[in-house]
């Protein structure tokens, strides 16, 4: 992981005009991405992830604020930025009539590579992404996972310093998603900085060295996955009772081992110290008041707990 910042933004904003008035899709985003990291932008659909990514990739001008990529200002030196980056949109961008090899060679030629060099580079990418056997087949015959890997390869033809990936595993089955994670880790191992957007909690947790959680165009938390989860103290205990949930919260919130107690979608959610030791005490207290839990689950804090703590909403339900 690097220490120098290859991406920096300061108070980045983007406003769109709408019938109901101006909509600020990106509302003062300030962040830094270290060279060689996998950086994740985690948030629900409509949070401002893709808009921010498009600004950094010079596809959309910011309304205000500053952003630099590889030392170049995205607004004032976009051509220099584009030579340092690869960009893979969620929808991809490959031509369905061409073969995988042809698409890679075409991309290399667009970056002024000689034909022979582009052909060599195409073969390197096909081998690295395990697409060599399908290299001369039309892309229309590729599976979703193969097309996604090819699109990443297209973004890597010119060996960019930074690769932007917009929701790289959306729509993939679990096996294809796990394989894509391995490919992204390989990019980091080769020295490429990866900036990806995702609404998958497990993806952000498994892949990212650092991440920022964004909601309504604003960053609400940032750090490594473990640092963020440590912000949610103790264990998370969720209790389902038949009615009287507010009474249960009042009974439990003042216990010495309960850090926080609240209601979420009809369930009592507690943040407790040493949850396995707390459960017997809680059960005895509820039983003494004639209350019998219908369900009870205990888990370590997750990134969803971080999102819930910062926004009052569950990212799993928001993204569903």
Where are these regions (language model features)?
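Conserved protein kinase catalytic domain
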Residues: 82, 126, 229, 249, ...
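ABC transporter nucleotide-binding domain
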Residues: 181-273
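Residues at or immediately flanking beta-strands
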Residues: 66, 138, 236, 260-262, ...
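ABC transporter nucleotide-binding domains
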Residues: 4-9, 14-221
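C-terminal coupling/interaction segments
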Residues: 274-320
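Preference for bulky hydrophobic residues occupying beta-strand positions
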Residues: 14, 31, 239-241, 270, ...
């Amino acid at each position: 992981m690097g220490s120098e910042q290859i991406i920096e933004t300061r108070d980045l904003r983007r406003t769109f005009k709408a019938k109901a008035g101006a909509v600020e899709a990106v509302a003062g985003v300030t962040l830094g991405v270290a060279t060689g990291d996998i950086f994740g932008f985690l948030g629900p659909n409509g949070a401002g992830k893709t808009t921010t990514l498009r600004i950094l990739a010079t596809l959309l001008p910011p309304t205000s604020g500053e952003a630099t990529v590889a030392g170049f200002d995205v607004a004032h030196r976009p051509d220099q930025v584009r030579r340092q980056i690869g960009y893979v949109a969620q929808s991809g961008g490959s031509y369905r009539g061409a073969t995988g090899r042809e698409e890679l060679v075409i991309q290399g030629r667009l970056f002024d590579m000689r034909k022979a060099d582009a052909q060599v580079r195409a073969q390197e990418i096909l081998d690295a992404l395990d697409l060599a056997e399908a290299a001369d087949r039309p892309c229309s015959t590729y599976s979703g996972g193969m097309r996604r890997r090819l699109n990443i390869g297209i973004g890597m033809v010119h060996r960019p310093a930074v690769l932007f990936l917009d929701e790289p595993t959306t729509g993939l089955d679990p096996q294809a998603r796990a394989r894509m994670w391995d490919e992204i880790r390989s990019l980091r191992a080769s020295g490429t900085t990866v900036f990806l957007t995702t609404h998958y909690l497990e993806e952000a947790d498994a892949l990212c060295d650092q991440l920022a959680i964004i909601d309504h165009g604003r960053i609400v938390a940032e750090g490594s996955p473990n640092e963020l989860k440590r912000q949610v103290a103790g264990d998370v205990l969720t209790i389902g009772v038949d009615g009287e949930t507010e009474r249960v919260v009042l009974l439990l919130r003042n216990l010495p081992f309960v850090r926080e107690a609240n209601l979420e979608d009809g369930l009592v959610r507690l943040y407790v110290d040493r949850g396995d030791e707390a459960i017997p005490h809680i059960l005895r207290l509820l039983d003494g008041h004639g209350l019998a839990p219908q369900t009870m689950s205990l888990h370590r804090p997750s990134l969803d707990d971080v999102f819930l703590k910062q926004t009052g909403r569950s990212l799993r339900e928001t993204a569903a």
